[in-house]
Amino acid sequence: MWNEFKKFAFKGNVVDLAVGVVIGAAFGKIVSSLVKDVITPLLGMVLGGVDFTDLKLTFGKSSIMYGNFIQTIFDFLIIAAAIFMFVKVFNKLTSRKEEEEKEEEIPEPTKEEVLLGEIRDLLKQQNSSKDRA
């Protein structure tokens, strides 16, 4: 059982996925900071000093922190847009690289193609010898 787990855990796809999750979490923190520390204050200046995180409805001792919810939605939209742009650029670069590799690769002829070429050459030789006779 341990060997099966090691084989699974250290497969290339699992390790790639783990790295992707860690990098994604770090990227999410960067974008959240961008939203919280840069974009929201700028938006607050444009809208007259509004800070979404402090918006709330109070009912006695309880509060509904709808401003924090709005901020979380805003974070999500910016993170989604940033990831979309990253994936779009990545896919464009990857497709260009694949196209270049396809252009550079000249496939070797298959056995059938080699055999057909030899048959063609033999037929040419036979036809040229018949024409001389």
Curated annotation (Swiss-Prot):
One of its GO terms (cellular component) is plasma membrane. NCBIfam families: mscL, PRK00567.1-4, PRK13955.1. Disulfide bonds: none annotated. Homopentamer. The keyword GTP-binding does not apply. It comes from the Bacteria. Gene3D superfamilies: Large-conductance mechanosensitive channel, MscL, domain 1. GO terms for molecular function: mechanosensitive monoatomic ion channel activity. This is Large-conductance mechanosensitive channel. The gene is mscL. Its main location: membrane.
